């Protein structure tokens, strides 16, 4: 919205500052954090009043989790308010990439909200039907993938790029849509599974957002893209502003989510944030790099897949409990040890992922 002020830059030269993505990214970060700080307490109080018993605690989970009973969920609403408000204020609303990323965030967030609602009202960790939820996610993600492919230039827009290789492209054609949808849905559910401990998902999401903020800015800048010999994707630089808002909203939410958490993110937030990051990866043509930068999320979702698959085939469990962060709790790690050590892993993987921009 503030981009509209650029039209007055001839009369007021100071308004030229709104042309700069870096300035607006910083503004989006601060604004999103301020919105969450400002409205967070009221949202928490309202959710606590309406939810009563709060998020149900799994009976087979670590014993230390039972003290969290009564903590409200749906904290993703706080993150939503920060990201949406800040993005509308600081983002370039003429960018198709801005709208498609926000669309996925809202769509996935709505699915997560309904899932949280069912869990709270039924007081069961079993919420929305898994098949129905995945079907809706793939519809939203598939539509987003189609928009992204249509917004670019063929054959590049339907091609898959590879890290460490300058010119290697694999044109997927129409199959780009299901591939991209899989990336977006996978990212959403991977972050969702990671969100099992206070602050565990929040910081890695911010780390991934910061990493892809850099990637989006460089990919959307012809000069930097040429220098680094990465693929230039016009218009994706604007996604840095949205990702700045994600970081700001994450910082604001972490204030309330730090242990002992006053509120949980819930599927409302985790699905939305994962879907958003996945969509940015697709738009910037860094889908494979997402698996590196978001490697912690990949580990979490793979631990669940392996656990379920092996148990169905052999009746035995690979991990004491899945997702894998609960496995380490069962081994005797304290919650803070698991969270901080996983944060460190997320930062290291993000740095490795960013190194692919230069190692070509």
Swiss-Prot record:
NCBIfam families: mraY. GO terms for biological process: cell division; cell wall organization; peptidoglycan biosynthetic process; regulation of cell shape. The chain crosses the membrane at residues 27-47, 70-90, 93-113, 134-154, 168-188, 205-225, 239-259, 262-282, 288-308, 337-357. Pfam families: Glycos_transf_4, MraY_sig1. This is Phospho-N-acetylmuramoyl-pentapeptide-transferase. Belongs to the glycosyltransferase 4 family. MraY subfamily. Catalyzes the initial step of the lipid cycle reactions in the biosynthesis of the cell wall peptidoglycan: transfers peptidoglycan precursor phospho-MurNAc-pentapeptide from UDP-MurNAc-pentapeptide onto the lipid carrier undecaprenyl phosphate, yielding undecaprenyl-pyrophosphoryl-MurNAc-pentapeptide, known as lipid I. GO terms for molecular function: metal ion binding; phospho-N-acetylmuramoyl-pentapeptide-transferase activity; UDP-N-acetylmuramoyl-L-alanyl-D-glutamyl-meso-2,6-diaminopimelyl-D-alanyl-D-alanine:undecaprenyl-phosphate transferase activity. It catalyses: UDP-N-acetyl-alpha-D-muramoyl-L-alanyl-gamma-D-glutamyl-meso-2,6-diaminopimeloyl-D-alanyl-D-alanine + di-trans,octa-cis-undecaprenyl phosphate = di-trans,octa-cis-undecaprenyl diphospho-N-acetyl-alpha-D-muramoyl-L-alanyl-D-glutamyl-meso-2,6-diaminopimeloyl-D-alanyl-D-alanine + UMP. Pathway: Cell wall biogenesis; peptidoglycan biosynthesis. It is an enzyme of class 2 (transferase). CDD domains: GT_MraY (cd06852). GO terms for cellular component: plasma membrane. Its EC number is 2.7.8.13. Its cofactor is Mg(2+). It is found in: Cell inner membrane. Keywords: Cell cycle, Cell division, Cell inner membrane, Cell membrane, Cell shape, Cell wall biogenesis/degradation, Magnesium, Membrane, Metal-binding, Peptidoglycan synthesis, Transferase, Transmembrane, Transmembrane helix. It comes from Chelativorans sp. (strain BNC1). The keyword Coiled coil does not apply. Signal peptide: none annotated.
